[in-house]
Regions:
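Intrinsically disordered, low-complexity segments enriched in small/flexible residues
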Residues: 1-60, 64-66, 70-71, 185, ...
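Catalytic-core regions built around general acid/base machinery
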Residues: 81, 85-89, 116-127, 306
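Conserved small/polar residues in nucleotide/adenosyl-binding loops
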Residues: 303-310
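Structural motif
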Residues: 61-62, 95-99, 134-137, 156, ...
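Glycine- (often His-adjacent) and acidic-residue-rich active-site loop
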Residues: 65-70, 77, 99-119, 288, ...
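Conserved catalytic cores of soluble enzyme domains
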Residues: 100-220, 312
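Glycine-rich anion/phosphate-binding loops
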Residues: 46, 72-84
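Structural alpha/beta core scaffold segments of enzyme domains
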Residues: 88-96
Length: 314
């Protein structure tokens, strides 16, 4: 990977994709300096590595922000690289995965950077319902950058270092981080309902690989893999799953393959992906006899997510 071979951003890509499968796009792109004396600043790849590779043989497009380059901030060319990646992904019908570690807008580029945000938002909106969009927040994701995971289909957050916010917690009158950290993975998962999974970087990358293997590549594709499980096997422990339908669904699924969305939000309802005879199935189940508001919103949001897919429901 040009100019950033040893960066954490490139390491994350290498850990996510199948070995030696990554092909970089736009590795020689740097910032287009126009204002605020940026001419002498080094901006390798303009702070974001973009390209494509495979996960368990499936094509995916990936961008990974490099916090060592101006804090991973979004400038004009940084944004154009991400928007261009979306164009390639839509043409080939493959998912986009964003690995976010960004301090927000690059103030030195002013309105050029603001326009870049608009280009990314437009690309995401055009891809919505066409290809899966996945975002993992490993560091800071603040300001206008916070809209990007909100517009994607699946969001992951590093539980200790991930921070997701439009305004910092201290911007709320009478609040401070020690009182209520509204930027934390716990808050964004339990209260905002934005995060599907929170954990370590290794856990997140593993979960993304599992999720990609279950999802259709696009809205015209079917998610199907060869079933290696015994379709006639007995599920002896179903009686012990009465209190948690999530466990029940994982027992029913081929080889226990199971991915729960919005796991920390609206816990009275389970929304998940499982596999039955090799086919990916969307599942909605209740954990309690009465739905709360959050659980109902969660179920409706999940059905909207799958509205453009051809898969079955349970």
């Amino acid at each position: 990977m040009s100019n950033t071979a040893q960066s954490l951003a490139s390491t994350r890509i290498a850990s996510l994709l199948d070995e030696n499968s990554f092909v970089e796009i736009g590795g020689q792109v740097t910032a287009r300096s126009t204002d605020f004396n940026m001419a002498g600043m080094e901006t390798p790849s303009d702070g974001v590595i973009t390209g494509y590779g495979v996960i368990n043989g499936s094509l995916v497009y990936v961008y990974s922000q490099d916090a060592s380059v101006m804090g991973g901030t979004i400038g004009e060319m940084h944004a154009k690289k991400i928007a261009r990646l979306y164009e390639f992904a839509q043409k080939t019908g493959a998912p986009v995965i964003g690995l976010v570690d960004c301090a927000g807008m690059r103030l030195q580029e002013a309105t050029d950077a603001l326009n870049g945000f608009g280009e990314i938002y437009m690309a995401q909106a055009m891809a919505s319902g066409v290809i899966p969009q996945i975002t993992a927040v490993f560091g800071t994701c603040g300001g206008g950058m916070a809209l990007i995971p909100a517009m994607t289909d699946f969001t992951f957050m590093e539980s200790k270092n991930g921070k997701l916010f439009v305004n910092s917690p201290n911007a709320l009158d009478g609040n401070h981080v020690s009182k209520c950290d509204t930027a934390s993975a716990d808050f964004q998962g339990e209260e905002a309902g934005l995060v599907d999974f929170a954990g370590t970087e290794e856990e997140i990358l593993g979960q993304i690989r599992n999720l990609v293997s279950m999802l259709p590549a696009n809205n015209e594709d079917e998610a199907y893999t060869e079933c290696e499980d015994d379709l006639n096997r007995a599920c002896a422990d179903l009686a012990n799953c009465a209190g948690d339908t999530g466990i029940l669904l994982s027992q029913l699924s081929d080889n226990g393959i199971y991915f729960e969305t919005k796991a920390a939000y609206g816990k009275d309802v389970v929304t998940a992906f499982i596999q039955l005879n090799g086919a990916t199935v969307g599942a909605v189940a209740n954990r309690s006899e009465i739905y709360g508001e959050d659980g109902t919103v969660k179920a409706v949001s999940y059905t909207h997510l799958r509205a453009h897919e051809t898969g079955a429901y349970l």
